Design a protein with these regions (language model features):
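Short aromatic/hydrophobic "clamp" motif used to bind/position activated sugar donors
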Residues: 83
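Active-site donor/metal-binding and catalytic loop motifs
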Residues: 174, 181, 199-202, 206-227
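Cell-envelope/extracellular polymer assembly enzymes that use nucleotide-activated donors
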Residues: 2-5, 33, 191
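Glycine-rich, basic loop-to-helix element that forms the pyrophosphate-binding segment
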Residues: 61-78
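Conserved small/polar residues in nucleotide/adenosyl-binding loops
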Residues: 264-271
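N-proximal low-complexity "stem/linker" segments adjacent to membrane-targeting elements
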Residues: 1-25
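A conserved acidic beta->alpha catalytic loop
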Residues: 23, 38-47, 63
Length: 271
């Protein structure tokens, strides 16, 4: 069995795609396959990659199915023990696969790992790092890797996570697919974080390796939500409410049940 399957989802990617693929080929760990999924690109990026990398496995979709469905299609072709889901605007450190595989091999309770995320801006690999909160709040950390926890965490970056194959299969068995395709694009990784935690899988940030990420490259690298297209904004807001519907509502329901139990089981004071 191949050790790692790298699934890349492309839709009209720009020049950063070339650097992304070069970083893959420069990995110190070599036991991997690349599954290149194209979501109906019209800018010639698919043809360029096919010419430069004939050994990749290519999956060509006629339409842009969005991130969730596109990745699900790519995952269905993966044969590796571990599966890396890689955005096209990510540059991996040369030891990325090696360190992540080592972490997964050493701990069978890990369902997902990823390295430390750094910003990639204007063609430069920067050294500041940031983490994303579950509510969409980003905390910028300008002091190297300070604040990055070496251990279990609720979630890691959704731009370059590596999942255990058995984790993927267990999610598919429970829900019917790995990513919930209702999300299309945005918050599908947060959905998985809740789901993996519920199923008892651990997630870990591997601090001995890193990856650089442009962020939102498919929507013109616009960082602020309101700088992106109206359709993207609407989808993000919809997906936030969908997350709340799926998970957070249960917390409020349980809390209200708890309060009602306290109210009706407490002794009633007599006048």
């Amino acid at each position: 069995m191949i050790k790692v399957s790298i699934v890349i989802l492309n839709w009209n990617s720009d020049n950063y795609l070339k650097d992304c693929l070069k970083a893959i080929c420069a990995q110190s760990f070599k036991d991997f396959e690349v599954i290149f999924v194209d979501n109906g690109s019209s800018n010639g990026s698919l043809e360029e990659v096919k010419k430069a990398y004939p050994t990749f496995i290519y999956v060509e979709n006629n339409l842009n199915y969005g991130f969730a469905r596109g990745m699900n299609i790519g995952i269905s072709h993966a044969q590796g023990e571990y599966v890396l889901l890689l955005n096209t605007d990510v540059y991996l450190d040369s030891n990325y696969l090696e360190e992540c595989v080592k972490a997964l091999d050493c701990d069978s309770t890990l369902g997902c790992v990823a390295g430390v995320e750094y910003p990639w801006k204007n063609g430069k690999l920067l050294q500041s790092t940031y983490s994303s909160g579950a509510l969409g709040i980003k905390l910028h950390l300008q002091l190297g890797d300070m604040g990055i926890v070496d251990g279990y965490t609720f979630g890691v970056s959704g731009s370059f996570p590596i999942y255990r194959r058995s984790t993927i299969l267990s999610v598919q068995k429970m829900t019917g697919s790995f990513f919930d395709e209702m999300f299309e694009t945005g918050w599908e990784d947060t959905d998985l974080r809740f789901l993996l935690a519920y199923m008892g899988w651990h997630t870990k940030c591997v601090v001995t390796t890193r990856a650089w990420h442009i962020g939102s490259a498919s929507v013109g690298a616009a960082k602020r939500l309101f700088d992106k297209s109206k359709s993207y904004q609407q989808r993000i807001f919809r997906n936030r409410f969908y997350i709340q519907y799926k998970y957070i509502r249960n917390i409020f329901i349980l809390w209200n049940v708890f309060l009602c139990c306290l109210l009706y089981t407490s002794p009633i004071p007599r006048d």
